[in-house]
A protein has these predicted regions:
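Bacterial Sec-dependent N-terminal signal peptides
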Residues: 1-27
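Surface-exposed coil loops of outer-membrane beta-barrel proteins
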Residues: 45, 50-66, 95-112, 120-201, ...
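Transmembrane beta-barrel strands of outer-membrane/channel proteins
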Residues: 40-48, 87-91, 127-129, 177-181, ...
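Repeated loop/turn-to-beta-strand initiation elements of outer-membrane beta-barrel proteins
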Residues: 82-85, 122-125, 172-177, 202-207, ...
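Outer-membrane beta-barrel biogenesis signature
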Residues: 8, 22-42, 47-58, 131, ...
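Residues on the lipid-exposed face of transmembrane beta-strands in outer-membrane beta-barrel proteins
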Residues: 40, 44, 69-78, 112-117, ...
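Glycine- and aromatic-enriched membrane insertion/assembly motifs of diderm outer-membrane
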Residues: 62-94, 252
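Outer-membrane beta-barrel pore domains
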Residues: 58-64, 95-106, 212-340
Length: 340
């Protein structure tokens, strides 16, 4: 795996140097149009599992009990004619969970920090820390239909620090290749291993690949507009680690828009792990099926999301009281999100 990583790194660097050399001969005397933007979100929620002990599914975010905080997310970005940057900071429990791989003091607030340069028409290079390209769901609650998250999202990568090149081949076809630190090592490379990533986009469907030291993940993310008001999102992934350890899953996201201000959606996810991966159990194999029904009411920049989630596992993994465990769990969440 080390030799493979070195090979991908060399190929990646040669590709960047080639495009940079080609573009160096192209000058543009026009005045650039530059813009600064400030945006972000805040979210808060109430959660109950209707059990004696506060217990939650083993997924990221929206897993605290009672009245709880999500995060405040502030993004400063600059977009010039040829270059730009994004500085994205987070505060609160959701933000802390999102950047758990940052061990330095101030870095625990940094969700994304990167600069990019358009080296040719339809070709850009990005260097820094950016959220992952794998999966259907994202860290920001405003961009997800469901407020709670899936197992596939929770145990895949959150962020990468490295360099990537994006190719916009046409309106419907895109390609990305990149070399990164190991997954979620956001500040620096602490173990000297690197990971290789790639994404192929075809007509709104995306095939994603991430390979590193004893890690390989293949992911499909996409969706289809079945009518003007009905959308079906799809995510499927498989990941293997050292030995036989790994996980796989598939989720469907049907969503129905009933008016300009209301939509209702369902997430049905089947997730399985092998050889004590740790999402469900510490030893052996296990699986979990979850159904999450979410309503989404929107008024301007404000969103209100009531949600009911049912989890059913292959073993008794939910501690519903000091003396009792269960294979199933019912959760209710009520969230408010504001974007700006």
């Amino acid at each position: 795996m080390k030799k493979s990583n070195k090979f991908f790194t060399r190929v990646f660097i040669c590709t960047m140097m080639t495009f940079t050399a080609i573009n160096a001969q192209d000058t543009d005397d026009s005045v650039p149009q530059s813009t600064f933007n400030f945006s972000g979100t805040i979210d808060t929620y109430f959660r109950s599992s209707f059990t004696e002990d506060p217990v939650a599914p083993g997924t990221s975010f929206a897993n605290l009990n009672g009245f709880s905080l999500g995060m405040a997310n502030f993004i400063v970005s600059y977009e010039g004619e040829k270059s730009g940057f994004v500085a994205d900071v987070v505060f609160g429990p959701r933000g802390s969970d999102a950047v758990f791989g940052s061990v330095g003091n101030s870095s625990e607030m940094v969700n994304q920090l990167y600069a990019y340069y358009n080296i040719a028409e339809g070709v850009s290079i990005t260097l820094g820390n950016f959220n992952t390209f794998l999966g259907y769901e994202v860290i920001s609650p405003a961009a997800n239909f469901n407020y709670s998250t899936s197992y596939m999202f929770s145990y895949g990568p959150f962020s990468h620090t490295g360099a990537k090149v994006d190719f916009s081949i046409s309106e419907d076809v895109s390609l990305m290749i990149g070399v990164f630190n190991q997954t979620d090592q956001t500040e620096a490379n602490y173990d000297r291993y690197t990971a290789f990533g790639a994404q192929l986009g075809l007509y709104g469907q995306y095939i994603n690949l991430l390979a590193g030291d004893e890690y390989f993940q293949l992911d499909y993310t996409g969706g289809f507009d079945l009518s003007d008001s009905f959308f079906l999102g799809i995510n499927a992934t498989t990941a293997t680690l050292a030995g036989d350890t790994g996980f796989a899953g598939i989720a469907l996201y049907p969503q129905l828009t009933t008016s300009d201000s209301f939509a209702i959606g369902l997430r049905g996810e089947f997730f399985s792990e092998t050889d004590g991966f740790g999402a469900l159990v510490s030893e052996g194999d296990a699986d979990n099926f979850s159904l999450t029904l979410t309503g989404s009411f929107t008024s301007g920049n404000f969103m209100f999301k009531p949600e009911l989630r049912l989890d059913s596992a292959s073993s008794e993994i939910f501690a519903i009281s000091p003396t009792e465990t269960s294979e199933s769990l019912t959760s209710f969440v009520m969230a408010m999100i504001y974007t700006f």
